[in-house]
Amino acid sequence: MATGRGSRYLLTIGRWRRSFGIAPQFRALAALVPGVSHVDNKSDFLGKRPHRRHPGILQLSCVRLPQALAEAGQLLLLGSAMPNMEKQVQALTNYLWSRHLPVEPEELQRRAVLLEKKILENADSCQTEKHHEEILHALRRTTYHWQELSYSEGLSLVYMAARLDGGFAAVSRAFHEIQARLPEFQPQTLMDFGSGTGSVTWAAHSTWGQSLREYMCVDSSAAMLELAEKLLKGGSGSGMPCVPGVFFRQFLPVSPKVQFDVVVAAFSLSELPSKADRTDVVQTLWRKTGHFLVLIENGTKAGHSLLMDARDLVLNGKEKSPLDPRPGFVFAPCPHELPCPQLTASKPLACSFSQAYYPIPFSWNKKPKEEKFSLVILARGSPEKANRWPRITQPVLKRPRHVHCHLCCPDGHMQHAVITARRHGRDLYRCARVSSWGDLLPVITPLELPPSAQDAQDAPES
């Protein structure tokens, strides 16, 4: 039974439930309405714009590569005359998606100790050398063999065909969030670590246009840098670049004296050989950050876990740069700085998002695709100024007269909210119904309500 204060969390579906015959276990789930209350109208958007354009809407429509970039990519691929390009693209795509992080020495040692204990329990203790061979064989069989990718001219072209469009879509979605929530922010400088084909530069230029006057692209592969420069120049080594002010380097500048308004590492941290290397790079990138640090990886458990490590490293960093002592906070996607509830759940899930895009037009690339990715955007300054609305972390389920939303909330918990017009008001119901996976839901939680409003909400319905 619901008691007193808890009664406000109950929802009666009534005639809908009787007509459709919901199973008892699903009735209990549908009756739960976690801590969502009324629509947050501090920005006074109600009455000025339709609900489908509420300020939490952040999803982009299907992303398309800039025409100059798509044509340059086509020209380079047609001129390469590489055999079986479609098969090579598919093989590299599958490999990059299924790739794991390298196993750390400490974890390898822990596995060896467990294997040794298991083998010794069931074997003759005199055969020490044989036991060592068994342990090594078992480790080789069960341990992921991570290898560093070395991008030659040919592999760089395959990577471009496989990842240019999807990478552009993911980065465009991240930049769109910054622009939509802070339209007054006009960055002038950008640094891209692990720049690859230069998709970050193109996405930034598409988002902020002429406000950006300097792009620093850093990649250890000379072949990748050469390819990125050709793409900027229409597919040739000569000519004027389509995006001015782009500079290329093979090594990450470590001096904290020069900062960039936006620093990006897209699908790059997972290419580093160890956790120590990732720690050093993230700390350097944060020192180089003037306003926003954007980190993007595959939407897998490995990618999400890696990003949460980087997030915690920045938030818990003891060292403060004397040149920029401003603290960091999470701008997106988390509405809090607490441990990720997706990772601490009994069955951990990757916090990921999806962006539709049109691929480079080739015979095997005709239909729109979806890029599934994880991201974290860290910002310098005070989190009090940030919007702390709950984030929708799964596709919204629209049902007759109610909507299911899975939310990551400002208190650091996941909530499954069932929103109805009767219980939560027409405005919040309409906002929830037009929202999508990845959007923010503009709500005031019960804890944020003034005492008079809370008392009214606690009162039983007649």
Swiss-Prot record:
Domain of life, per lineage: Eukaryota
Keyword tags: 4Fe-4S, Iron, Iron-sulfur, Metal-binding, Mitochondrion, S-adenosyl-L-methionine, Transit peptide
Gene3D superfamilies, A to Z: Vaccinia Virus protein VP39
InterPro entries: Mt_RNA_Methyltransferase, Ribosomal_Rsm22-like, SAM-dependent_MTases_sf
Transit pept. (range): 1-31
Subcellular location: Mitochondrion matrix
GO cellular component: mitochondrial matrix; mitochondrial small ribosomal subunit
Pfam families reported for this sequence: Rsm22
Gene Ontology terms describing biological process: ribosomal small subunit biogenesis; translation
GO molecular function, one term: S-adenosyl-L-methionine binding
UniProt: [4Fe-4S] cluster binding residues: C334, C340, C351, C408
Family: Belongs to the methyltransferase superfamily. Rsm22 family.
Notes concerning its domains: [4Fe-4S] cluster-binding is essential for its ability to promote assembly of the mitochondrial ribosome (mitoribosome).
Oligomeric and partner information: Associates with the mitochondrial ribosome (mitoribosome).
PANTHER family, alphabetized: 37S RIBOSOMAL PROTEIN S22, METHYLTRANSFERASE-LIKE PROTEIN 17, MITOCHONDRIAL
Reported function: Mitochondrial ribosome (mitoribosome) assembly factor. Binds at the interface of the head and body domains of the mitochondrial small ribosomal subunit (mt-SSU), occluding the mRNA channel and preventing compaction of the head domain towards the body. Probable inactive methyltransferase: retains the characteristic folding and ability to bind S-adenosyl-L-methionine, but it probably lost its methyltransferase activity.
Name this protein carries in UniProt: Ribosome assembly protein METTL17, mitochondrial
Organism (species): Bos taurus
Higher taxonomy: Eukaryota, Metazoa, Chordata, Craniata, Vertebrata
Gene this chain is encoded by: METTL17
